[in-house]
Amino acid sequence: MRGRTAWALLALVLAIISAAQAQTPTRETLVQKLQEGTSEERQHAAGVLGDMGDDSAVPHLIDALKDDDEVVRELAEHSLWAIWNRSGDPQINALLQEGIHLIQSDRLDEAITKLDEVVKGAPGFPEGYNRRATAYYLAGQYEKSITDCEAAIRRNPMHFGALSGLGYNYFKLGKPERAIRYFERALDINPNKPRIRSTLIELKRALHQRVRDSI
């Protein structure tokens, strides 16, 4: 009797595990749902890929930034940042999060020092450069910020955050033509940035007026 009960219990446990595995979507399934699913399925896939996705999911999430569904677009952007913030090394990830917290606390010198550790520890990791670029920008060190933005883009050409960062740096340096170029590139990838779009419109208007005044 005890043996039969044990076998029955084992069979039940295996059935539960099998059912749970069947309910857990694979990355491939999520990508397919993101591309071809209903609005609700695309929303779910766009959100879950932030936790389950890796670099292979990035092109599909980039495409989802232009989805007809606003929620899908927002979740896709959130998932992109989640993936981009993961280096594959827990220690580097922790250092990055410390650097981000220091930026948010306006402790910029400390943030730069912390993000130096990220860049030295993971020189191929784009987000280390991008976050340090943000700290440099907020500290008014625009040339250093530009260097880091460019480093991030070399490692991740679709990084709309680093592209818009170049736009803001060149804007601060009084180079509107370059700023416009990078704002447009950022919006080509991620059109869901009203602040960048507004800045771009104002820049183009000011540049047009400057040309008219020079005639």
Regions found by a protein language model. Give the residues of each.
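Terminal, low-structured helical/coil segments at or just beyond the last alpha-helical repeat
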Residues: 98-101, 180-215
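Amphipathic alpha-helical scaffolding segments comprising HEAT/armadillo-like alpha-solenoid repeats
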Residues: 23-33, 54-65, 89-96, 147
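Helix-start (N-cap) detector for alpha-helical repeat units in TPR-like alpha-solenoids
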Residues: 39, 92, 126-127, 160-161, ...
